[in-house]
Amino acid sequence: MQTHHDLPVSGVSAGEIASEGYDLDALLNQHFAGRVVRKDLTKQLKEGANVPVYVLEYLLGMYCASDDDDVVEQGLQNVKRILADNYVRPDEAEKVKSLIRERGSYKIIDKVSVKLNQKKDVYEAQLSNLGIKDALVPSQMVKDNEKLLTGGIWCMITVNYFFEEGQKTSPFSLMTLKPIQMPNMDMEEVFDARKHFNRDQWIDVLLRSVGMEPANIEQRTKWHLITRMIPFVENNYNVCELGPRGTGKSHVYKECSPNSLLVSGGQTTVANLFYNMASRQIGLVGMWDVVAFDEVAGITFKDKDGVQIMKDYMASGSFSRGRDSIEGKASMVFVGNINQSVETLVKTSHLLAPFPAAMIDTAFFDRFHAYIPGWEIPKMRPEFFTNRYGLITDYLAEYMREMRKRSFSDAIDKFFKLGNNLNQRDVIAVRRTVSGLLKLMHPDGAYSKEDVRVCLTYAMEVRRRVKEQLKKLGGLEFFDVNFSYIDNETLEEFFVSVPEQGGSELIPAGMPKPGVVHLVTQAESGMTGLYRFETQMTAGNGKHSVSGLGSNTSAKEAIRVGFDYFKGNLNRVSAAAKFSDHEYHLHVVELHNTGPSTATSLAALIALCSILLAKPVQEQMVVLGSMTLGGVINPVQDLAASLQLAFDSGAKRVLLPMSSAMDIPTVPAELFTKFQVSFYSDPVDAVYKALGVN
């Protein structure tokens, strides 16, 4: 068996890549003549005009798609002139309206959205920068460009002005409308050109096309950036990316394609997103290829069934409203910020914590096909943005859109079988991710076994990251996370792990200090969590105090029970020990932030005996079970989940009550055999076993 989770690092140094950059420019200009643009021109223009990148590059592609400096310079002047004369700046809207009135018609670039005014039975356009809300639109124009009705598109339009006394409609009307998008797309051109690039070069081409400079980016980071593009080439692909601020998480969805919509956090409605029952119109998921939610922490649905419908849609690509079952093709992307460090989150909580409470539900997260580790992507600095040639953004967007019609999900079966830990949803997720990566990297379908292996390894990692969080949220139901694949030729099995697999150091190796005890138990909230008791003993007269529980009296009482039992039964543990010569302070640490627990009496007893006798608890041991003041042992609630949590936290030994022995069949054998188990029948027996005294 092997562990296989390293992405390939191409054997090319940064210096070579820098010189290769110019070869890549030459290759691009040779095989994509007229389809490439220098990205530094985009940056220059972007700083002056608040226009999406694909609009700028559409214009640059018309005038500057050449490697002749004179042509580029002349083209750049043309584009600047068009932006100066025809692009409407919101503060100059009144001036442009006046121009339209004086000249009778005028050509402008603006974002146009259309709605039907049923009272007047006309389509009315809203021009966002010009500030006109009711310009008349011919119905044929709307039929030809349906996206005008949902969210709107950037267009080059000719606006007419005609006014006569007593007219009920607006004097403004649209004469011509040309969407700023590629008119047609020849996929054979892409397939033929792709043959002239190797895989690493093609990854660099894709990254340059969205404005990144691959020479300054590590190989693993490149894969994360490419994965951000999968929703553009795969239908109904669900992905989330949480990470620090400033890593460009939403950039691709906002700037790089006219087919994606970025919904900024905040309220959204079922009618807007899925289906408006009043107007019988499908919402955003029917009109856009990608719907991305920015700032997931702020998402709220006005409707109670919003999350429910979203679950339905994410699982099947369809949902029902009223009597209709409606299908959509849009991929769902969830983007958000992580405020703590990843190490802290992995140890004490789960990596989906930034989602709003209404969405923290295993059924919802199980529908994610991938979780991109945003914390592995560096914060964006100027050197990460390219000044070289890349594909024109809307050409790239159209190529990605065409790839949605194809499927490469059977690529795995030619070379590999998936391991037995993957359930049906895992298999679908891994297939979708592999298919998406291959569509981006090998659109011509000419991929080798090694290409598929690399994509498969990455796909398993990003799905396993989802599964690991589900395991923390849902316990044993999601126990099978050891993803693997089997080579069809050699029948060798390779396991794939997640780099940030943390938490296993919560219970450190080595002998603990006397008075330190770890226990796994259910908190009052119902969540299973890990707790550490730390005890201090000073000279005194037998008093005890407890800290770390705040004002929770029932949790303090549970520890009081342990202390009183300790006081009354110490002679059964040790005849020589003197209880009343010391004062005891017990501090409770919640390692999983699950809240206080009332099942802590037994662990408190063990901690107090340990410090008084100056004998540590056995190495990496976890205490399970609790007791009453009369010494009756209570069995463990949800034994399987408790053992899973103990294992994930790094425990090697378990102290288990005899009364829980009947629950052992509920624990998977491969989990139970990971521990050295000591059974106890009463509290004093538990103390002896914990301290390793026979």
Curated annotation (Swiss-Prot):
One of its GO terms (biological process) is defense response to virus. Gene3D superfamilies: 3.30.230.10. Disruption phenotype: Methylation of 5'-GGTAAG-3' in chromosomal DNA, however BREX no longer confers phage resistance. The keyword Protease applies. GO terms for molecular function: ATP binding; ATP-dependent peptidase activity; serine-type endopeptidase activity. Keywords: Antiviral defense, Hydrolase, Protease. Belongs to the BrxL family. This is Lon-like protease BrxL.
